[in-house]
Amino acid sequence: MTIRMPNDRQRILVLGKTGTGKTCAAVWHLSQKDFKRKAWIVLNHKGDDLIDSIEGANHVDLNFRPKKPGLYIYHPIPDVDDAEVTQLLWDIHAMGDIGVYVDEGYMIPNRDPAFQALLTQGRSKKIPMIILSQRPVWLTRFAISESDFFQIFQLGDQRDRQTVQGFVPVDLEKLMQAPVNTVPALKKFHSIYYDVGANNCVIMTPVPTADAVLARFDLGKKRKQTL
């Protein structure tokens, strides 16, 4: 069965507890973007090594604003840099036609007005989004309700499964829960992939390895900017 990938206006929410392959899958989605035609920003609150290993990405300060295509990685400190992140997101909202990757959605406060504006208005402004979270119960509801695609890995907490359950047409408890010493129906590194617009839901096999995903990026010589 052929499955669709998010286009340059759509957003995907990638969920899963630590160690499920969530970040590798999200970076795999990111690797499919055309950085020669569009700028993407990455909010790497957790300092994820896989993200920081992308060759050719620009590592920039929070006061930097992209003016040309490419990949720009920011490293905000949770709580400390919240105001700067809000201003950055407002500026992206005003500029439009820039992709946004958020390494952990709950690192942005639930009521952040700029984040909510991107989630609710980003489609019309050509602002696609890739949002990750290991705890969907802590996410703003708009991150879930406004998603065009879901990729859901194993979620260990029942509250997280219940938070997402109303948005996907499969029984998450049945797929993710299993008696002691048995294997859940949703295998390791496999995920539930749901295309909301097409109402198409499949079990996706593991994405390529981290090294293979990193090799997909073609961004030229790696450099860091402090502006």
Swiss-Prot record:
Any one GO CC term of the record: viral capsid
An example molecular function term from Gene Ontology annotations: ATP binding
GO biological process: viral DNA genome packaging
UniProt-listed CDD domains: TrwB_TraG_TraD_VirD4
UniProt: ATP binding residues: 16-23
Compartment(s) where it occurs, according to its Swiss-Prot or TrEMBL record: Virion
Key words, A-Z: ATP-binding, Capsid protein, Nucleotide-binding, Viral genome packaging, Viral release from host cell, Virion
InterPro entries: P-loop_NTPase (IPR027417)
Protein's job: Together with the packaging efficiency factor P6, forms the external part of the portal vertex that is embeded in the capsid and which plays critical roles in genome packaging and genome ejection. Both proteins multimerize as a single ring-shaped heterdodecamer arranged around a central channel.
Assembly description: Heterodimer of P6 and P9; further multimerizes as hexamers of heterodimers. Part of the dodecameric portal complex that is composed of the packaging efficiency factor P6, the DNA packaging ATPase P9, and the internal heterododecamer P20/P22 which spans the virion inner membrane.
UniProt-recorded name of the protein: DNA packaging ATPase P9
Organism: Enterobacteria phage PRD1 (Bacteriophage PRD1)
